Amino acid sequence: MPPRDDLSLTDARRIALAAQGLDRPRPRRRANADDLRRVIDRLGLLQIDYVNVLVPAQYQVPFSRLGAYDRASLDTLVYRAPEREFTEMWAREASIVPIAHWPLLRYRMDQQDRRYRAFTQFLDKYPDYSKSVLEEIRKRGALAASELPEVDGSRGRSKGFWGWSQARCVVEALFMRGQVSVTDRRGSNNARICDLTERVIPRALLERTVERGEAIRGLLRLATRAHGIGTVSDFADYFRLRIREAQRHVAELVEAGDLREVRVEGWREQAYLHKDAEAAAASGRSRLSGSSGSSGTSERSGSSGRSRPEPLAALLSPFDPLVWNRARIARLFDFDYVLEIWVPAAKRRWGYYVLPFLFEERLAARVDLKADRDAGVLRVISSYLEPHAQPKRDAVAHALAAELQTMAAWLGLSGVQIGRRGDFARTLGAAARD
């Protein structure tokens, strides 16, 4: 079949979902380290966010693709593997990335002085103290900021940025500059444990010099593969690249054959298709649409022991790469989404921690969730159905109810409690009781 220059919005959605690994059944067995490795490699990064009203974001993104898995296995893979394959870096924001990406992101460490001046000013304000922190780590090995004395020699809490101690601000700045790297997370607050970068990142990667343009092209290759299809602004946003710079290098990727210019129904901006994306999407098309066929017997299982046939469905973290660019998901899915954590309660439209629900190839609903660990239940504070999903209201409700049960079991909660708020609450509650 010859390449097409005009794509429907449905085609674009399928391509995007396939690129994100959301077009296929979850493993029937419990996901393992190899599955987690493939997810991170496919996405290029996992954004770290420890808002724990439900589960930290870096754990939920694999869950959306793999179903229930042992969260400790992700920590082991990232921080405690015999040969380090992944590390934390400022990629999009603080992220888990394949360690091989270090040379591509290295040039950006010098730019952090401008982006995060509130932190790096501590290195200029306390140069001798900053040197002493590095020397302390050199002598004692990997440390948490809480194990370091403050500037005045005390171990008390002195006010820094966001109320952090000055020691933590200095360690954060050293991390942003690439002078220290994260070896582990520890304690109830998941504190970073940092060592000298030269003892964490392999020498071959540290010594590899990548010119800025080559690094940007490398990051854009990762972004375009992870998106499958998109605009320059979509691709630039993936690793927080400058749009003007990205524009030039996207043109070079088109010339090199990595991307192809296409037109997408309803898009005003020029769209670009990754060279491998259309074929990958075609292989998952019947699964996305929920049609029967050779893949129709596939099932998705969670730790609850319940399995359900296709169509595919998944709750998505607010920090999932599929939805973190709000303009992109509005264009792709006609889904108006904003995370309202920082919005005063009285002004929130949907809720505090609202997750989009993917059903087949559309974002069909949204739910405000809270893991109530004291009560042992997953609370659905509010639930809303998207207008386009009304004809499939019952099907969406049953798929979402099953996904909520799977998530609750994965989080070690005994059940799901569905609140009355929202236009989908009654239907969802009935489906959960079936």
What is each model feature region?
Residues 1-291, 300-328, 332-354, 359-434:
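Long, low-complexity intrinsically disordered regions
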